[in-house]
A protein has these predicted regions:
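Extracytoplasmic gate region of multi-pass secondary transporters
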Residues: 33, 225-268, 273-282
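Helix-breaking motifs and short loop linkers at transmembrane-helix boundaries and internal kinks
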Residues: 44, 76, 97-102, 131, ...
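Cytoplasmic membrane-interface "Motif A"-like loop-to-helix N-cap segments
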Residues: 74-84, 286-300
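Helix-loop-helix hairpin linking two adjacent transmembrane segments in secondary transporters
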Residues: 133, 141-196
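Flexible cytoplasmic inter-helical loops of multi-pass small-molecule transporters
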Residues: 188-217
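A late C-terminal transmembrane helix in Major Facilitator Superfamily
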Residues: 345-382, 390
Length: 409
């Protein structure tokens, strides 16, 4: 094998190893929504408290995301990803022993702290291992891994693994133990594969000047960038919809008379369609050089899908709506990560900081999605008002896409 082939193989090996950390994170994250109806009954939660728990991980991104993005850019991915795994793994173990809303909330917020590191570390890893024109496929790998973790929480975590282990508490315990163990595996793998040895020349030259660039200058450049601010709007809608739907869809369907098993599997359908969107939309957008049009199209698809969920009961129309919604948000997911490195003044060097900014603001939507659905249900006795809020967000995404200048890889 040629030297270039060995470098490429090593780069993909690191991406695959890091992807396991994302899969573990999303499985742990969404074990609570998968078991939400059970936890509500057992712990005695109100709809508002359940919504806060479902939105607690996104809530941590608001104060921490920008700081974490800057830290990942400077600390190194071997230490930072291992620390993230350790934090959310220990928090999941703590969540298995929680006895009420305060302890559940504290542990879930701590999961969010570790989650920020993984969310911004993976785009950074891809940006240093691959040149900008070749980041699409490796980015899809870790996003599919993240979706697999989420889908597994609903498809096998609730109906299979949880009952086998004895309920939600043992499931939380052992998934946390796995994450803590994998922190050691990742750190060892990163050292053996040598992240520095896989860093391409276009990134090394920028790394050499990194120390001379102050954090404050980097942040000012991020905040002043018009196109990045529009990406933030799209990111906010993406997070509003995906966290709102993933956090509440099983409970919404159970309230319509669907059994817990099929309700969880319907949520897996959302994630499966999300994966298809992740794989298809950025590829088509880059081939047609039409990322702006892709953003607008995804917003329209999300709106139509949510209308189907609203009107479809538990029948085929609902299922089609779930698929459309999942496909639309799946398409937005890689776009909000792929656009920042291509923006003038951002590039690979500031990718972690830029994506951190997108999520720092965008996770306001990620927090409000689940909270509004739960609160509006408490106030009205219906999930329809919350779903209408998500549909309104899809319209906003269309407008933000229209205002963008197209950026294509």
């Amino acid at each position: 094998m040629s030297e270039q082939g060995e470098v490429t193989l090593r780069a993909y090996g690191l991406v695959l190893a890091a992807t396991v950390s994302y899969t573990s994170l999303t499985f742990i994250w969404f074990t609570l929504p998968a078991y939400l109806s059970v936890v509500i009954e057992e712990v005695g939660l109100t709809g508002t408290e359940a919504g806060i728990l479902a939105g607690a991980v996104p809530l941590t991104y608001i104060p921490l995301a920008l700081f974490t993005g800057v830290a990942v850019d400077r600390i190194g991915l071997d230490y930072s990803l291992a620390a993230g795994l350790l934090i959310f793994g220990l928090a999941q173990i703590g969540r298995s022993f929680a006895t009420g809303f305060p302890s559940l909330l504290a542990c879930t917020l701590l999961i969010g702290v570790g989650a920020t590191v993984i969310t911004f570390g993976l785009p950074k890893l891809v940006s240093i291992l691959f040149p900008p024109a070749e980041t699409g496929f490796p980015s899809s790998i870790y996003l599919v891994g993240a979706a697999a973790g989420t889908a597994s929480a609903f498809a096998i975590g609730r109906p299979v693994i949880g009952p086998f282990l004895g309920g939600w508490r043992p499931l939380f315990l052992w998934s946390g133990v796995f994450a803590v163990g994998y922190a050691v595996v990742w750190f060892t793998t990163a050292r053996v594969f040598s992240l520095e040895g896989t860093t391409p020349e276009h990134e090394r030259s920028e790394d050499a000047t990194l120390a001379s660039n102050s954090i404050s200058r980097d942040i000012r450049a991020i905040l002043a960038h018009r196109e990045l601010r529009l990406v933030v709007v799209v990111g906010t809608v993406y997070l509003l919809v995906i966290h709102g739907m993933q956090g509440w869809l099983p409970t919404i369907l159970e309230s319509r008379g669907m059994d817990p098993g099929p309700a969880g599997q319907a949520t897996s359908l959302l994630i499966g369609a999300n994966v298809v969107g992740i794989l298809v939309v950025p590829t088509v957008a880059d081939r047609l050089e039409a990322r702006r049009a892709a953003v607008m199209t995804c917003g329209c698809v999300i709106f139509v899908g949510l209308a189907g969920v609203l009107a479809g009961g538990i029948g085929l129309l609902m299922a089609a709506g779930v698929v459309a919604t999942g496909f639309g948000v799946g398409g937005l997911s890689p776009l909000i990560r792929a656009i920042p490195p291509e923006l003038e003044g951002i590039g690979a060097r500031l990718t972690g900081t830029a994506v951190g900014f997108v999520f720092a603001v965008g996770e306001i939507g990620g927090f409000l999605g689940p909270v509004l659905i739960g609160t509006l249900h408490d106030l009205t006795g219906s999930f329809a008002p919350g779903l209408l809020v998500l549909a309104g967000g899809a319209v906003v995404a269309v407008g933000a896409g229209y205002a963008m200048q197209d950026v294509s890889g």
